[in-house]
Amino acid sequence: MKNSPVAKLIGAIPNRLQLAGGWIDQPFVNQHNPKPPGSMVVVQIAPDFRPMDRSGIASGTRHIAMKLWKGKLPNRPPEELARALYEVENKGKAEPSGSQDMIGLVYPGVNRLDYDFKVQGGVFPSHIESCNSPKVAKWLSRVLHLLPVEPRPDGYNPLGVKNLSPAWVAKLGQSGQDCYDAIVKMDAKKLGAALNLNMKCWETLLPHVVRHPALRVELIPILKAYQQQYLGAMYSGCGGGYLIVVSEKPVPGAFQVNVRVAQK
């Protein structure tokens, strides 16, 4: 399929999926963590579909990477690639994108990113724990279901209200740890619980992530319904995008992704 018309259109650079713990990569959040490091999980997924723009799949970062590296990841250490991409994307930005966007694109497999404000100012992880087990990747590809909801609209800013309670920042970082542990153990129930905890943290810390006058869709009722019916659910990013549902059974209307692991 590498030479198919769709593959040529999309390009060879992977996509990235953010799971539990997102926002802990931002120094304005992780500086309030009383129990550092706080963790989050990113997953590299195959570029076999075109994601909606402005939907939490790091399509903006990937677009920059496509231009910077002419459609293909260079054969260099992923840490080096992530830092280079971070510098290019955030040059002159008042509100820089978090480093998880870049790391998720260039690190294969499932990655737990540990952030500590005392290490590199909380901009880059103090440690990255990676899982490139084909068995785990196949399992995760089977239990994650993406349901398109709606891209975040123009004029939307998720940072209008910040309730950065240290206790809730600690819970956010713990949701990432729980998420990674559940994936490595292939425990769908605990994975769903980690995604649900992540959403409680987002709703508490940064309420405009899920509630905002510019949003045309009521995100919370959709989230709650899927959390009640399935093992767990979270939005792919601020303002909606996709609803990521954890289920060992099919989810009508959703599609599945292919988790990429390091090639031996």
Language model features: what each stretch is:
Residues 1-59, 66-96, 100-236, 244-264:
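C-terminal nucleotide
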Residues 239:
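Glycine-rich nucleotide-binding loop
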